[in-house]
Every structure is written in C-alpha cells, then in structure tokens.
A protein has these predicted regions:
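Basic, often amphipathic N-terminal segments
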Residues: 1-75, 100-154, 173-181
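Short beta-strand element of the conserved SAM-dependent methyltransferase core
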Residues: 5, 93-97, 166
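Short, low-order "capping/linker" segments at domain edges
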Residues: 86-96, 172-181
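Low-complexity, intrinsically disordered Gly/Pro/Thr-rich segments
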Residues: 148-167
Length: 181
C-alpha cells in the first residue's frame, strides 16, 4: 500500500493564514478555475513509497535519521503551480523561496535509506512544496493558472517545523516523530 514520509506544515497556526487562504480561494474561483482543494492537512512530502514491504525496517532507519534532525523555522512565501507527473492535473502549491538545507538533507537521507532497502519509491527529483489544490489540466492550461496565481498577494507565513510523520496515502499514521528543539 502506498505510504509517505512528510513534514507537517503548521501554517494554520499563523494568524493571517485563514484570511489569506479564503481570499486566495475566492480569487481563483472568481477567475473560473475549477479546483479540488486540499484542506487542513498541510505537509511537505519527503518520500513517496509505492508499497509497504519494508515499513518496519524503514521506520527503524527513519528513527535514527529523525534523531539527528532538529526542528527548524521556515518562511512560506511563494504561491505557484506545476503540472503533475501524469499530466492530468496542475498542482497549486506554496513553498519557500529559501528552502532550509536541513529539509533537502533529510529528503536525501530518506531516499538513500529507501535505496539501501530496495524500496520502491517515486524517484522524481524532490520539489519541496505544500499542495493546496489540484486543477484538471484538460480544463485550464498551466499558463492560465499561473497568470491568476501571480496576481494574488504573496503569502508570508513563518512557522516552526517540528513534526515528521510516516503515513499511508489517504490513511492511517504509521509513525510520528517530534523533532528536537
């Protein structure tokens, strides 16, 4: 069963989040863009695994990896979109213009661990982002979507990343790690 390792992104704790998100969704709707919004569970996927053959072994290794990974601040300050790998949808996302090197390092470590166990995982290059919604690619071009997004006021949300979770895709948690301060 598909599962993934993610860093939880606590943007909802930011005072301006709800207002900004509501306004952003309203402007996109007013532009006539159909979006299937992802609500409430905001995260940055570090590793997407296609099966669960080695979950116990991976979790032991992830445990060691997470013991070396400290909580860290991040500023979410960019709204954009890209086309998903299958080409069927465009992903509306948030990210940081300055991704902390620790995030890149832990994603690389997770992939190295998965490789060492011959785990079947998504090997596309790591693109740190927080998915907000999906737009059908047959309804709106990426250029049209980006044109609308780039007219929306840029977000600036500061948060502390302090929790990593291994979970089944659209399902139960497998393991949660609270990061050290």
């Amino acid at each position: 069963m598909a599962n993934f390792l993610e860093i939880k992104i606590p943007v909802r704790k930011d005072e301006g989040w709800n207002e900004w998100a509501k306004e952003m969704r309203s402007k996109i709707k007013a532009a006539g863009i159909p979006v299937r919004w992802q609500m409430f569970h905001y995260h940055m996927t570090l590793l997407f695994l296609d099966d669960d053959n080695c979950i116990e072994d991976l979790n032991q290794e992830f445990e060691q990896c997470m013991s070396l990974f400290y909580s860290l601040p991040i500023t979410i300050d960019k709204l954009d979109a890209f086309t998903a790998g299958d080409g069927a949808s465009h992903i509306i996302y948030l990210t940081s213009t300055q991704i902390p090197s620790q995030i890149l390092a832990v994603a690389e470590d997770a992939r190295t661990l998965a490789d060492s166990m011959n785990a079947n995982y998504d090997k596309r290059s790591f693109k740190p982002h927080v998915t907000l919604g999906r737009v059908p690619a047959d309804k709106v071009s990426l250029e049209q979507l980006q044109s609308v997004l780039h007219r929306i006021e840029k977000p600036v949300f500061r948060c502390i990343l302090n929790e990593v979770e291994h979970r089944y895709f659209k399902g139960d948690k497998i393991k949660t790690w609270k990061l050290k301060y």
